[in-house]
């Protein structure tokens, strides 16, 4: 009752509706306008009376009463005196809530600089004054005077003077001839007297004249700050404070603890310091104290204000009583525990509970089991309301009692309340949106939440003690969204790749697999059954078994929906699965008339979903789960020790390999191969042996055996069934159980040469066990570290992509990406069909032979189209992509294509950026958590040959070959590609051939699929001569540039080039091998250069001086890096490196133009390479390459734009600059996909494209035109387009720019929204920049809206935003018409606008 009366007198303040938030610097006048009074005393509260001191930090006169409607002295109490100010204590009679919003101020006796503008790098104050930060600090902290007005003296403006110099100057010139000041007053004067317009003009003219890069950068930085001040209306002198605002007392509370002590916020301490020093300074000034004392006090005041705003930014950190640094205002905002991330983005919610989960196989997919106790607590308000409505109770208090006593009627009402009221279940860590799903609760006894087994994959949950949280959606809208969008039955497909995620796993798979096995010679083989009833009868009476080969009639419907039946050769088990299939012509019995491995089950569910829709799929999944569990239970598959079969041939394979290894040792001892080569070969040999043993073991386990007596097939090996069905375990783990464990990796990632020959069944020897512990421990350490890394990657991805939302239907762009199949080492790893499915065709797709249309331009490519396209043998297709979408904010539906989680075109308002970030980030954590599953077992992947992946005719591009002395064809070209053309002359595959490879085919040869095209040594890279002659060495000085390394164990010497630049004597050498012709002159190459081959560090010489060589002979070999194990451990940092667009350590150098290589004069330790352009009018380009890097080009080689001059990982920026956006996109997509593919994770390309789009938002101005930009400015792409449109309208010259690639962290910090950037990283820096520029945040992204507490502009919230936008534009239109006076504007109904969906692309 009381509350209701209160509400009558205090109408709730209506929620403010705003569209944007602006941040700027507060002027002293502004701070005073906020304030309710000045704080003069450092006292907080009176410790005897517990009343706040007057004019102190908690003063009730300034900030408001402590108790509602009661003044401090108690003269006025109650509501009737509302608004009266007590004449005795001066306190206004009002709500105590005002103590949360009323501010005070401290009037400073001397101005102080705001530390953010001083110390947040780059320092704004020093840049604006064009001084160094050190100098500004010297003035501010009273070390030096600064000349502000030199007058007619010889002093310069802004010259620093020490105390002595100042005194001398005063003596020399007299005190009134010049002005020199010290402290913040000096800086204040200088800032106040700045003429910004004049400075900007000067800077612009200076910029036009200057040529040096460094100077330009400096001038641009200063000009940017000057312009920011001019545009934002901020004054430079506001960066120096004369008044300090004091935040409301209830935001820095002082709480009494028991025992008469108090807990206080650190801010009170910091404020106290400021007030104390300020009061002391006032007193000193009044007393006319000596200058030095006043200066010292001013310095201390400056330091205390610094500590209040940002403790520890400058000088020592101010600590409290317990040596803990005090939390300043900046620390309140920063970091994970700061205001942004802790309270605004990470709110805790009411109406929630958590408990352990257990499996609930009898639940339907849309249900979950909720413990009664929990439900009673969660739904309390609903129960109270219902009790009241039904007349069981008349007050809330009564209802409370009924519920506490758990009366029977309460349970009935709980049932009613819960009915069709979905709840949300969430399992931490929530890595993607499937980590929170809605279910309908069913009440269960006990205290554990029951979870449906099929959703475990999505939650990544298991029942070994996992806990889950339950949340109750309260409002009708929330319940509706939970039901329509978040229900588990609506999340059948995985948003990352569009494959079903509601797929049976483990026991269920095993049961279904067991059901679908077909065995020979079972009872009743060959029987025929007319319908399923008969079959059930036969199974019950054991006439047939589940695995008998029978002929059975299966009834279904054809494509028109007419019933028909057909007889299949099948087994009773498979017919039982078929019985559950929905009746649909597109879902034939054939999809389950096979062994049901996990893959096949997934395909089956996918087919059912695509053709029968969601409802049928859900019912089908539930039934198939029941069937799987039932038969897994019946089959009783278990495994024992003898199921692990050790192949008989293992001993022989091991012995053979040991002999081979001995042979390699011998070769090494004889000096034929190097230590590195031996290592590589040994590791390779053991790798092959392990594979062989594994193959033998698999063959043994797979083998089908028959019982001699009955002739029936023996049951299959249990372990094989588990692994083959996909229920649990991998061939790799089986190999470790029954084959041999194989090679292990050291913690550093190198492989230990001695493998583990035993397996787990035989048991490991002590040495083997010790070797294996490295891998095991590394796995565990990695797991711990990588989880954090992966989480951080996800956070950065979400941050960069959060404002990418589908805002329009079609942007009508004419650009897109070209998609081809990805072929790796002759294997198609991603087919063209898989990559274009669910994307929009950019051009019409026609059959290359018949010319008939397969897909129209602008239409989505669906499953049937993919089949047609692959049949037609089309090699590449141009599709629309989010990367090339021309919408200004967000992307359009057509460019994005299919919504993978729904299988339909993407809806308006879908937050595709966040989905992309989650899809990429989620497997990162999964994989890192899985590292140790490999147990550090090494897998050696080294490619040493090229196979034909198709049948056809060979064509060699850039052919440059020689026949060597053995008569083999050797590739001498740097960029030769072997292409295979089909009979129509269409290119089917194209693969690069490494320099020095042996070719087995030549131009025009016919090849079969799988035929070897070329091979090479995977461990070394040869250097070969293309002319015959005699060898001569140049600059190969013993001990300086070449070392005769004698191998201790063998006594054989080999010559290896060493780093000749490490000694001063060798710095000018150019080690090379020269070929002389018969007359003793240097032989000439076919391209006109000399036959001089420059050597790189570590090259091993294969010839001696004076040796006669013929064409194609090897002169030297450069060893390649030894094999490291491939693990996502290398993968996660690689993904981060690509997304952060970092330059790799030894990055490739890419040719910027087509042309001929010329080697220029070398520098001390760099080699000059010049490309002479092929076409006229292009400048030659020069590169500097570190000597000693393997450099394979010769003088006169022809090189194409985009070819590598120096091998390595290319820097993404170079690809963008040289080859353009499309090449960059395909590089990043392929590289990132490769990491995930290694782990068998499927992610759709479009997710990576969305992130890359966000990385390409900025443009660097190359030609400013008539705009106000400066060359070299980084501008938002959208902003530039807008500015150019205006310029073109006015008939001026537009500005031009090149796209810039930013890493995801940088891109996040450069978003237009300062709120989003500040909540991500570097909070102070972001806010400082934004304040100076007077930035306005338009609240476009998701994050900013969450922070200010509005609905996000995506999904259902997006619709509201849209309606508001349309309404605003309507209002403007009507006002415009009224102004024109043409009467009311004819307004079409709002709905029509909605139907047209957001205005078309601008």
UniProtKB/Swiss-Prot annotation:
Zn(2+) 2 binds at residues 811, 885, 892, 895. Binds 1 Mg(2+) ion per subunit. Pfam families: RNA_pol_Rpb1_1 (PF04997), RNA_pol_Rpb1_2 (PF00623), RNA_pol_Rpb1_3 (PF04983), RNA_pol_Rpb1_4 (PF05000), RNA_pol_Rpb1_5 (PF04998). Its cofactor is Mg(2+); Zn(2+). It catalyses: RNA(n) + a ribonucleoside 5'-triphosphate = RNA(n+1) + diphosphate. GO terms for biological process: DNA-templated transcription. Belongs to the RNA polymerase beta' chain family. DNA-dependent RNA polymerase catalyzes the transcription of DNA into RNA using the four ribonucleoside triphosphates as substrates. This is DNA-directed RNA polymerase subunit beta'. It comes from Rhizobium etli (strain CIAT 652). The gene is rpoC.
């Amino acid at each position: 009752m009381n509350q209701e009366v209160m509400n009558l007198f205090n109408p709730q303040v209506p929620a403010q509706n705003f569209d944007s938030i602006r941040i700027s610097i507060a002027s002293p006048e502004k701070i005073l306008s906020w304030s309710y009074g000045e704080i003069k005393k450092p006292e907080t509260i009176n410790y005897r009376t517990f009343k706040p001191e007057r004019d102190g930090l908690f003063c009730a006169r300034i900030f408001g009463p402590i108790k509602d409607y009661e003044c401090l002295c108690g003269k006025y109490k109650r509501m009737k005196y509302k608004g009266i100010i007590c004449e005795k204590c001066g306190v206004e009679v009002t709500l105590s809530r005002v103590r949360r919003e009323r501010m005070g101020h401290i009037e400073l006796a001397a101005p102080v600089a705001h530390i953010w503008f001083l110390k947040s790098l780059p320092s704004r104050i020093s840049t604006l004054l064009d001084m160094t930060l050190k100098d500004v600090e010297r003035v501010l902290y009273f070390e030096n005077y600064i000349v502000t007005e030199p007058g007619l003296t010889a002093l310069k403006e802004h010259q620093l003077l020490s105390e002595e110099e100042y005194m001398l100057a005063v003596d020399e010139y007299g005190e009134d001839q010049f002005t020199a000041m010290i402290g913040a007053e000096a800086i204040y004067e200088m800032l106040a007297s700045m003429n910004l317009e004049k400075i900007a003009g000067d800077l612009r003219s200076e910029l036009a004249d200057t040529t040096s890069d460094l100077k330009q950068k400096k001038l641009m930085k200063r000009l940017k700050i000057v312009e920011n001040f001019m545009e934002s209306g901020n004054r430079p002198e506001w960066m120096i404070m004369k008044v300090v605002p004091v935040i409301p007392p209830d935001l820095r509370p002082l709480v009494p603890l028991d025992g008469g002590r108090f807990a206080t916020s650190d801010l009170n301490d910091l404020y106290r310091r400021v007030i104390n020093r300020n009061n002391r300074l006032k007193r000193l000034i009044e007393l006319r104290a000596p200058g030095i004392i006043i200066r010292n006090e001013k310095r201390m005041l400056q330091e205390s204000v610094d500590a209040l705003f940002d403790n520890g930014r400058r000088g020592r950190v101010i600590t409290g009583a317990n040596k803990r640094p005090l939390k300043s205002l900046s620390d309140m905002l920063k970091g994970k525990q700061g205001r942004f991330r802790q309270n605004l983005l990470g709110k805790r919610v009411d109406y929630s509970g958590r408990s352990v989960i257990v499996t609930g196989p009898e639940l339907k997919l849309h249900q979950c089991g909720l413990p009664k106790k929990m439900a009673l607590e969660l739904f309390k308000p609903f129960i109270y309301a219902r009790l009241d409505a039904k007349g069981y109770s008349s007050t809330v208090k009564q209802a409370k009692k009924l519920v506490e006593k758990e009366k029977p009627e309460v349970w009935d009402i709980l049932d009613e309340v819960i009915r069709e009221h979905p709840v949300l279940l969430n399992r931490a860590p929530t890595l993607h949106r499937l980590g929170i799903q809605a279910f309908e609760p069913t009440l269960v006894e006990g205290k554990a939440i029951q979870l449906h087994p099929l959703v475990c994959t999505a939650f990544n949950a298991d029942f070994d003690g996992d806990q889950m949280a339950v949340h109750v959606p309260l409002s009708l809208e929330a319940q509706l969204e939970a039901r329509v969008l978040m229900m588990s039955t609506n999340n059948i497909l995985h948003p990352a790749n569009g494959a079903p995620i509601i797929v049976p796993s483990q026991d269920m798979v095993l049961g279904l697999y067991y059901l679908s096995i077909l065995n020979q010679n079972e009872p009743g083989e060959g029987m025929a059954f007319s319908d399923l009833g008969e079959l059930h009868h036969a199974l019950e009476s054991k006439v047939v078994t589940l695995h008998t080969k029978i002929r059975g009639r299966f009834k279904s419907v054809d494509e028109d929906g007419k019933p028909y039946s057909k007889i299949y050769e099948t087994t009773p088990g498979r017919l039982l699965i078929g019985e559950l299939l929905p009746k649909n012509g597109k879902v034939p019995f054939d999809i389950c008339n096979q062994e049901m491995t996990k893959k096949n089950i997934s395909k089956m569910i996918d087919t059912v979903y695509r053709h029968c829709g969601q409802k049928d799929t859900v019912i089908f999944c539930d039934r198939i789960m029941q069937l799987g569990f039932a038969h897994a239970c019946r089959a009783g598959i278990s495994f024992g020790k003898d199921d692990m079969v050790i192949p008989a041939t293992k001993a022989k394979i091991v012995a053979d390999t040991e002999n081979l290894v001995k042979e390699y040792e011998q070769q090494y001892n004889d000096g034929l191969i190097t230590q590195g080569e031996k290592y590589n070969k040994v590791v390779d040999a053991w790798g092959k042996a392990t594979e062989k043993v594994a193959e033998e073991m698999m063959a043994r386990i797979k083998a089908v055996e028959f019982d001699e007596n009955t002739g029936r097939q023996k049951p299959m090996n249990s372990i094989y069934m588990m692994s083959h069905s996909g229920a649990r375990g991998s061939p790799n783990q089986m190999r470790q159980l029954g084959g041999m464990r194989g090679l292990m990796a050291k913690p550093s990632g190198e492989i230990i040469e001695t493998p583990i020959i035993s397996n787990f069944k035989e048991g490991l020897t002590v040495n083997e066990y010790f070797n294996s512990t490295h891998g095991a421990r590394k796995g565990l350490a990695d797991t711990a570290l990588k989880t954090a890394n992966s989480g951080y990657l996800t956070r950065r991805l979400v941050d960069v992509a959060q404002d990418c939302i589908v805002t329009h239907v079609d942007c009508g762009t004419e650009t897109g990406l070209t998609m081809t199949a990805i072929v790796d080492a002759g294997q198609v790893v991603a087919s063209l069909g898989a990559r274009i499915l669910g994307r929009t065709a950019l051009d019409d797709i026609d059959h290359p032979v018949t010319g008939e249309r397969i897909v129209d331009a602008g239409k989505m490519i669906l499953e049937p189209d993919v089949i047609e396209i692959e049949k037609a043998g089309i090699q590449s297709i141009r599709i629309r992509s989010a990367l090339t979408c021309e919408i200004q904010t967000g992307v359009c539906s057509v460019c994005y294509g299919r919504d993978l989680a729904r299988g339909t075109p993407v809806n308006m308002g879908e937050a595709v950026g966040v989905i992309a970030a989650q899809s990429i980030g989620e497997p990162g954590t999964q994989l890192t958590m899985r590292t140790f599953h490999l147990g550090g077992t090494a897998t050696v992947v080294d490619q040493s040959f090229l196979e034909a992946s198709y049948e056809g005719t060979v064509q060699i591009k850039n052919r440059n070959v020689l026949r060597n002395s053995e008569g083999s064809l050797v590739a001498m070209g740097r960029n030769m590609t072997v292409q295979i053309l089909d009979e129509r002359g269409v290119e089917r595959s194209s693969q690069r051939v490494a320099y020095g490879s042996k070719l087995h085919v030549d131009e025009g040869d016919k090849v079969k699929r799988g035929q070897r095209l070329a091979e090479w040594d995977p461990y070394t890279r040869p250097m070969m001569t293309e002319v015959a002659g005699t060898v001569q060495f140049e600059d190969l000085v013993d001990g300086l540039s070449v070392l005769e390394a004698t191998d201790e164990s063998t006594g054989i010497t080999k010559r290896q080039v060493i780093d000749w630049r490490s000694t001063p004597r060798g710095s000018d050498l150019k080690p090379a091998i020269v070929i002389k012709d018969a007359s003793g002159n240097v032989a000439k190459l076919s391209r006109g250069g000399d036959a001089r081959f420059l050597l790189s560090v570590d090259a091993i010489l294969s010839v001696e001086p004076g040796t006669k060589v013929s064409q194609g002979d090897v002169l030297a070999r450069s060893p390649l890096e030894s094999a490291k194990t491939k693990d996502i451990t290398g993968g996660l940092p690689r993904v981060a490196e690509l997304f952060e667009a970092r330059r790799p350590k030894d990055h490739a150098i890419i040719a910027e133009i087509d042309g001929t290589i010329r080697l220029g004069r070398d520098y001390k330790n760099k080699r000059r390479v010049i490309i002479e352009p092929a076409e006229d009018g292009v400048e030659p380009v020069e590169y500097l390459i570190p000597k000693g890097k393997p450099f394979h080009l010769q003088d006169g080689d022809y090189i194409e734009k985009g070819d590598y001059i120096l091998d390595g990982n290319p820097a993404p920026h170079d690809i963008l600059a040289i080859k353009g956006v499309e090449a960059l996109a395909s590089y990043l997509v392929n590289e990132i996909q490769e990491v995930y593919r290694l782990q068998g994770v499927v992610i759709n390309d479009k997710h990576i494209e969305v992130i890359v789009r966000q990385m390409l938002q900025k443009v660097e101005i190359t030609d400013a035109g008539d705009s106000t930009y400066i060359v070299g400015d980084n501008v938002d792409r959208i902003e530039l387009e807008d500015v150019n449109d205006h310029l073109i309208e006015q008939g001026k010259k537009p500005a031009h720019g090149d796209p810039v690639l930013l890493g995801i962290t940088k891109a996040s910090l450069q978003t237009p929204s300062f709120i989003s950037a500040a909540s991500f990283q570097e909070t102070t820096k972001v806010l400082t920049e934004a304040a100076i520029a007077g930035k306005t945040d338009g609240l476009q992204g998701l994050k900013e809206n969450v922070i200010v507490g509005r609905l996000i502009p995506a999904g259902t919230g997006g619709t509201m935003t849209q309606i508001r936008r349309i309404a605003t534009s309507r209002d403007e239109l009507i006002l415009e018409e009224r102004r024109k006076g043409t009467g009311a504007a004819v307004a079409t109904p709002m709905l029509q606008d909605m139907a047209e969906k957001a205005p078309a692309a601008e």
